[in-house]
Amino acid sequence: MNAEVKYDTRDSKVDTLPEGVKYAICAVSGGMDSATCLFHAVRTYGAENVCGVALYYGQRHDIELAAAKEECDSLKVRYIELDVTPIFDFNRDISALFAGSKKEVVQDKDYATIMHEKIAKGEAPISDEYIPNRNSLFINALCAIGLQVFEEKPFAVITGIHSDDVLKQEGSNVGAYPDCSPEFAIATNKALQISTSGLCYLYTPLLHKTKTQVAEFGKENGMTYADFNKTWSCYKGGTKQCGRCPTCIDRINALVKAGIYVTTIDIIDNYDVTAETAMKYMGK
């Protein structure tokens, strides 16, 4: 450990690069957000100084894990997979993302619509896909691994939480994903700094970005059309992403707005949707 502790001076700016850090460990889920962070980490620190970690928590399918591994392999980044299913075996009906859950993944509505409908019913706008404290668990696991992999050199834990994940009602402190909020990120960074004597930093480069801005940031960091389509965001399995669950809807809309999808064929080729649905996504 450091003989003299120098704590992070970024304060609330956890979406900016921490100073003096040359190593990074990334949370990789196989989706677009974490892939963007992985490309950014490799461009910033070099593949040899980056590690990717994926969680198997008993999700409905393992396609996203295969996508996460492929991303790491293509960038020549070390890939680690953790099985944390025992932690989530106590009540699998609490999240629609768990295999065997009685909750169903909502279709044909984006997250903003779902949140506003919940609020109208007087319900807390927490997503049915929220997994209890997963991000906190993930971040702390990455911190523990990073301390070993990087042999107690200062490093960053990078996660892909972004502003569209928060979805708070104005004036409320409850959002769709409570562990994706700036408040959570700032507090977690401080806790990591204290618990590691200043060795581990939380870096959330997408924290204040919308999904469309995430896609644009991915392009800036070298992601191509093919790279985006290798990622898997869909909550359902199959040979193609469904194009109808909330994460598919938000993803496709972002890729269209960012100019990555420019024709209906781009959508039809990669999602299980009709030509009519693809045209709606393209605004036709």
Locate each region found by the language model.
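Extended hydrophobic/Leu-rich segments
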Residues: 1, 115, 278-282
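ATP-dependent adenylation/nucleotidyltransferase module used to activate substrates
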Residues: 2-225, 248
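Generic structural signal of hydrophobic/aromatic residues within well-ordered alpha-helices
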Residues: 94, 252-256, 278
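Local cysteine-cluster metal-coordination motifs and their immediate loop/turn environment
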Residues: 136, 140, 144, 232-253
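Short, intrinsically disordered, charge-biased short linear motifs at domain edges
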Residues: 220-223, 228-238
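Iron-sulfur (Fe-S) cluster-binding segments and ferredoxin-like electron-carrier domains
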Residues: 240, 246-273
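Long, charge-rich boundary regions
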Residues: 268-284
